[in-house]
């Protein structure tokens, strides 16, 4: 693609969240430029991320706010991300290949962990080493590490919060209840409390957020053709209600897909705002999918009847083992009595 003229030649499958056209029409080409810049920009952290400025400064990147400026940043590390295997080669003559850039196999920077997780002011020479941390979304401090050839995400917490305990406990509770959830374990990195979770993407497993999918596709149509995905959606609404998760926006529930691009519902993730919901808390996914504004409890009661959950062991759980056990117990009982 030519970012100046908008000319595009499509040689293979594109990301779900990128739409461009092979066209000589002026408006189509303007749209191509806008869309590719938006896609590139989506692979750059937001400035509200804790230590975002330290991360950008370490790589000598500008503190960009516009899609144009973010695109210039993303292109410096070829738009690499651990979300998928898409990347950008700037020129045909450029001496780079997927083999030389593949984040799933290459080394990570120990310095980036100190910058991304603790805000230590350091400098990074190889911008590709910053790609995993520069492209990770969310506000909480986080950093990628490699242990025994496995990738893990360390996720800290904002000052004064209890996010690490909340995320680890919500994950443990939901797994005990039988939900398909990312495992977050409490750990300590250089004296800093954090959760640790294994990377769930790979060279053959990509992710697309619901927000990204809905940029170009109709999610209700997807649910009609794949009812098993809608059932998983209902399970998510129940899970978020049970642990009082207030941060389930359309950017942090996901679909996974392999090389065949067959979509499946991703494991539930991101629980650092668990146990914060109150009676009036709204369910944002319902609003995104069904265009209805309902409370988290109303959505859960509706979804509970459609989720196909095995609740046989729910009443036998010893809630005293959990710091937030009583909170969840009350919500479990309300659903079981519905």
Where are the predicted features?
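Phosphate/dinucleotide-binding and metal-coordinating scaffold of catalytic cores
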Residues: 1-238, 242-245, 255-338
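Conserved protein-kinase catalytic-loop position immediately C-terminal to the HRD catalytic Asp
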Residues: 251-253
């Amino acid at each position: 693609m030519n970012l100046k003229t908008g000319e595009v030649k499509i040689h293979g499958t594109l990301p779900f969240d990128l739409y461009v056209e092979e066209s000589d029409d002026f408006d189509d080409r303007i749209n191509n430029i806008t869309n590719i810049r938006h896609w590139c920009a989506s692979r750059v952290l937001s400035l509200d991320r804790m230590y975002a400025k330290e991360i950008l400064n370490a790589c000598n990147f500008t503190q960009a706010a516009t899609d144009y400026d973010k695109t210039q940043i993303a292109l410096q590390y070829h738009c690499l991300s651990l979300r998928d295997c898409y990347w950008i080669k700037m020129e045909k003559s450029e001496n780079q290949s997927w083999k030389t850039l593949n984040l799933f196999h290459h080394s990570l920077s120990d310095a980036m962990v100190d910058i991304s997780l603790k805000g230590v002011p350091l400098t990074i020479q190889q911008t590709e080493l910053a790609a995993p941390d520069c492209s990770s979304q969310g506000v909480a401090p986080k950093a990628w590490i490699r242990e025994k050839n496995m990738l893990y995400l360390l996720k800290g917490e904002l000052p004064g919060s209890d996010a690490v305990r909340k995320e680890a406990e919500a994950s443990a509770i939901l797994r005990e209840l039988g939900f398909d959830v990312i495992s977050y374990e409490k750990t300590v990195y250089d004296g800093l409390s954090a959760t640790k979770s294994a990377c769930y993407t790979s060279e053959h497993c990509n992710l697309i957020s619901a927000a990204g999918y809905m940029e170009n596709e109709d999610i209700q149509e997807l649910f009609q053709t794949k009812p098993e995905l809608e059932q998983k959606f209902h399970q998510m609404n129940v899970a978020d209600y049970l642990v009082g998760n207030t941060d389930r926006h359309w950017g942090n529930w996901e679909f996974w897909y392999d090389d065949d691009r067959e979509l499946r519902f991703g494991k539930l993730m991101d629980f650092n705002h668990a146990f914060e919901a109150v009676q009036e808390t709204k369910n944002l996914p319902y609003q995104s999918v069904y265009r209805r504004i309902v409370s988290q409890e109303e959505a859960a009661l509706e979804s509970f009847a459609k989720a196909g959950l095995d609740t046989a062991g729910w009443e036998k759980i010893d809630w005293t083992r959990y710091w937030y056990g009583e909170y969840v117990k009350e919500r479990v009982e309300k659903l079981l009595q519905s």
